[in-house]
């Protein structure tokens, strides 16, 4: 019995994860260029932004504008990261194909990233998710 998966899907995350901690704010156009480079390289799944409060992650303040400007591609799946129900509501109003949800594995990460322990965050998001 093989433990290897039949397929592996690679998701490009640089437009979101690669930019979220940068001090210099990139314009929406610069982010679109980064997405276009990923498309030109053959990426078929791209995490383009995060739907978080702009004060928490200023680099993602243009999430909706970025999504509205993405090139329509039937062969590509665009993803956005959410941390809570408000983020999901914002994502639903865009053209994105998927929502990614971070679930912290440790209390330290949970406190630093979401402001909750891993268990508290998981219970809260499970309850929220059932409502959708």
Range-by-range predicted roles:
Residues 2-23, 100-113:
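N-terminal small/glycine-rich loop or linker at the start of catalytic domains
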Residues 6-12, 31-47, 55:
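N-terminal glycine-rich anion-binding loops that anchor highly charged ligand groups
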Residues 8, 43-44, 74-78, 97:
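Short, well-ordered coil/turn segments that N-cap beta-strands
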Residues 15-30, 78-84, 112-115:
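Active-site mouth loops of central-metabolism enzymes
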Residues 18, 38, 91, 99:
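Conserved, mostly hydrophobic/aromatic
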Residues 45-66, 104-116:
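Glycine-rich, proline-tolerant flexible connector loops at the mouths of alpha/beta enzymes
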Residues 50-72, 76-79, 83-90:
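N-terminal active-site wall of soluble small-molecule enzyme domains
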Residues 122-129:
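Conserved small/polar residues in nucleotide/adenosyl-binding loops
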């Amino acid at each position: 019995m093989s433990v290897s998966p039949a397929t592996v899907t690679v998701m490009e995350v640089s437009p979101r994860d690669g930019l979220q901690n940068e001090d210099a704010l990139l314009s929406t156009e610069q982010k679109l260029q980064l997405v276009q480079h990923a498309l030109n390289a053959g990426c078929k799944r791209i995490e383009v932004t995060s739907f978080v409060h702009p004060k928490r992650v200023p680099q993602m303040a243009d999430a909706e504008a970025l999504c509205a400007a993405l090139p329509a591609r039937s062969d590509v799946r665009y993803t956005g990261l959410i941390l809570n129900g408000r983020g999901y509501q914002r994502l639903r109003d865009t053209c994105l194909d998927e929502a990614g949800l971070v679930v912290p594995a440790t209390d330290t990460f949970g406190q630093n990233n979401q402001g909750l322990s891993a268990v508290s965050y998981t219970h809260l998001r499970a309850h929220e998710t059932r409502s959708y």
